[in-house]
Amino acid sequence: RTATIEHRHLWGTATCDWFSENRGDLGLEYLESWQPHLYIVDHGGNGITPCMADAAGLPLTGEAYTAKYLADTEYVVELALRTGSRVLLVDQPVSRGDYRSGTGEIYRSMPVRHPGGLVRFFSTWPALTPGGQFVQSAPCEVTEPGCVDGRGELREPPPNVHLEALGAWRYAVAIVDELVAAGWVDAELVDVTDRVMP
């Protein structure tokens, strides 16, 4: 099968923002008809949208927040497992101020909750925030995007925390390496060692 890819994104979303009740035909439930080989789930734990609010419209906190993210993550895993799809749950790098994602421990628990090898947890910390510490910039190779004179920015300037070109590249490479190590993707299909990135 082939697909037409439309670039659509929203800022600050939670997992529940991507269900059909909130996104209509863009909901994750519609992926089932494609029977994807793999789901990669990566949410840092945002809780500012209406689907993450309590009955009074206030953002969920504490146990209610954790319970909601746990239930929503379970739902995504169940959607994937209906078609025998694999699921890689990705913990985001540590944020500015050394804040950890709100989903890391939930994601870490999923392979135990769903034994059988179709559900895996992966942390991007070693690639972007070694030792659990926020890193703004790092030494780099000329073949990596965003590398200027042997150094590149991993994250946006303060106060933002999103990934710059070098950070996004290392994030993606770390995930691909994990997929290859799991045997879920053929290494030859993703080999970019002979390509110089812009």
Residue ranges and their predicted role:
Residues 34-35, 83, 156:
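Residue-level preference for short coil/turn positions at secondary-structure junctions
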Residues 26, 34, 38, 64, ...:
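Extracytoplasmic/secreted proteins, especially bacterial periplasmic and envelope-associated proteins
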Residues 5-9, 37-43, 85-91, 120-123, ...:
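Structural recognition of the beta-strand scaffold that forms the well-ordered cores
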Residues 15-16, 59-67, 77, 91-98, ...:
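Second-shell loop/turn segments in exported
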Residues 1-2, 82, 113-116:
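Short, well-ordered coil/turn elements that cap or connect secondary structure elements
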Residues 94-198:
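Catalytic His-Asp segment of secreted/periplasmic serine-dependent ester chemistry enzymes
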Residues 1-63:
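Conserved SGNH/GDSL esterase-like catalytic core that processes O-acyl groups on lipids
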Residues 42-48, 76-107:
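Active-site segments of SGNH/GDSL-like serine hydrolases
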